[in-house]
Curated annotation (Swiss-Prot):
It is found in: Virion. This is Retrovirus-related Gag polyprotein from transposon gypsy. Its main location: virion. The gene is gag. Residues 298-407, 419-451 are annotated as: Disordered. Residues 313-324, 352-364, 398-407 have a biased composition (Basic and acidic residues). Residues 332-344 have a biased composition (Polar residues). Keywords: Transposable element, Virion. The lineage of its organism: Eukaryota, Metazoa, Ecdysozoa, Arthropoda, Hexapoda. It comes from the Eukaryota. The keyword Ligase does not apply.
Length: 451
């Protein structure tokens, strides 16, 4: 097919109108077009060839770009110098006769022992470093060797077993390196400082909160001492202490913070002193308020009591007006009634033949010899009326009879018997139904009168 006489109708839709316009695209093919318009039908093979050509061009362009980037990365990698970690080898200390040192070993002997407690390691490490610095310039001398040996012998317990298991040589730096690897804090400094800034008092007492801040600060300072040189450690420690002071004030309760923050303390002990003074003043004010409130309530209740009883005459004062020699005492009616009911006499059930019988003269002159030398037990020491009341309670409780009726009945029978048996009546015509008179017998046939 010749492309010289082929045309294609392309309809272009404009945004403003719905009309269509035919556009000739033959010039895009690089062929001159005639005025005649014909329809074009393309073969699928030709369409596939066009698509393959476009894909190949795009892939070649991307491949060239990727190749350029790979070449630049390769050049950068070649320019980098990767340094492998260097392993430091420690040698055992030895004695050189040419090196002399006359410094005494007292400071080395004063270093405390270390038994493997992690909380004590940083303090022991600092004291050991301070003591060893005096002998460090005399490496090879006998004093230097003795100093390192003494420090090694100060390490005992789990820490000493650790050095033995790793076959650590007799070298101060080697000993510290091995102990640092085991007992140093592996937490990052950033996390430790973040934990210090997040401390809050909450419901903790003031001193407990201060101790918590000190613990967090100690962890941070120990980490700085372990990972930095002396000069850098001093600068970082000063910065961390300022952060700890700010965290302590910010974490206080609102009432304490309102007092401590305007004072601008310069260190933690000063801030603690201000906080304790503020806490004491708050407690005093709270106590004063509660005490004043209690006094006010007491005064108010006293005034109400006076107004309640005001205007009522006093019976005792009225009695004094009538006769000053006779006054009525206030009585507790409830308690008196209870005592009266408890002490009310109860009649005793005794045999009618032995009722109100006096002891004979023979018994008065010759008491029972069998009981003369016997010791009276607790039951015999009790008084007659009380003993009879107990017996009455035991006997009459199951019957549930009225005490008044029983008393009247017993009294009537006793009077009738006295009238019929005058020979048994006492000479003074006295009657006692409680068994307290001479000649009266109880239920257990024991005399309760005078001996």
């Amino acid at each position: 097919m010749s492309w010289a006489h082929n045309y294609r109708k392309v309809k272009v839709e404009y945004e403003s109108e719905d009309s269509w316009e035919e556009e000739q695209v033959g010039q895009a093919l690089g062929r001159p077009l005639d005025s005649a318009t014909v329809d074009i039908t393309m073969d699928p093979n030709q369409i596939q060839a066009l698509i393959d050509n476009a894909v190949r061009q795009a892939l070649s362009q991307q491949q060239s770009q990727f190749q350029t980037q790979l070449n630049s990365l390769a050049a950068r990698v070649q320019s980098l110098q990767v340094e492998a970690p260097q392993i430091k080898i420690y040698e055992k200390v030895s004695v050189n006769p040419d090196v002399r040192c006359d410094i005494p070993l007292d400071i080395i002997k004063s270093v405390p022992e270390f038994s493997g407690t992690q909380d004590e390691y940083v303090a022991w490490r600092q004291s050991a470093i301070y003591a060893y610095e005096l002998f460090k310039p005399y490496n090879g001398s006998s004093a230097h060797y003795q100093a390192v040996a003494i420090l090694r012998n100060k390490i005992r317990g789990a820490a000493g077993a650790l050095l033995v298991s790793h076959n650590t040589v007799l070298n101060f730096d080697a000993i510290l390196a091995r102990l640092d690897c085991t007992y140093s804090d592996k937490t990052s400094l950033r996390l430790l400082r973040q934990g210090l800034e997040m401390v809050r008092q909450g419901d903790l007492p003031l001193m407990q909160y201060y101790d918590e801040v000190e613990k967090k600060l100690t962890l941070v300072t120990n980490k700085i001492v372990m990972t930095h040189e002396q000069e850098g450690a001093d600068l970082l420690n000063a910065e961390v202490r300022a952060d700890a002071l700010h965290a302590f004030i910010s974490g206080l309760k609102k009432a304490l913070r309102a007092v401590v923050f305007p004072a601008q303390p310069k260190d933690l002990p000063s801030a603690l002193a201000l906080a304790r003074e503020a806490e004491a003043s708050i407690e005093r004010s709270m106590f004063a308020n509660s005490y004043a409130k209690a006094v006010e309530e007491r005064a108010h209740s006293g005034a109400n009591g006076k107004s309640r009883f005001q205007g009522k005459p006093n019976k005792e004062e009225q009695g004094q007006d009538r006769n000053p020699h006779f006054t009525k005492r206030p009585k507790n009616n409830g308690q008196t009634n209870k005592d009266t009911q408890a002490q009310a006499p109860q009649p005793m059930e005794v045999d009618s033949s032995s009722r109100f019988r006096q002891r004979t003269e023979h018994y008065q002159n010759h008491p029972n010899e069998s009981n003369a030398f016997k010791r009276r037990n607790s039951s015999e020491r009790s008084t007659g009326p009380r003993r009879q009341r107990l017996n009455n309670v035991v006997q009459e409780a199951p019957k549930q009879k009225d005490p008044k009726e029983e008393y009247e009945k017993t009294a009537k029978a006793a009077v009738e018997e006295i009238d019929s048996e005058n020979e048994y009546a006492p000479s003074d015509d006295s009657l006692n139904f409680l068994g307290g008179a001479p000649g009266c017998r109880s239920l257990n046939d024991g005399w309760l009168g005078e001996p």
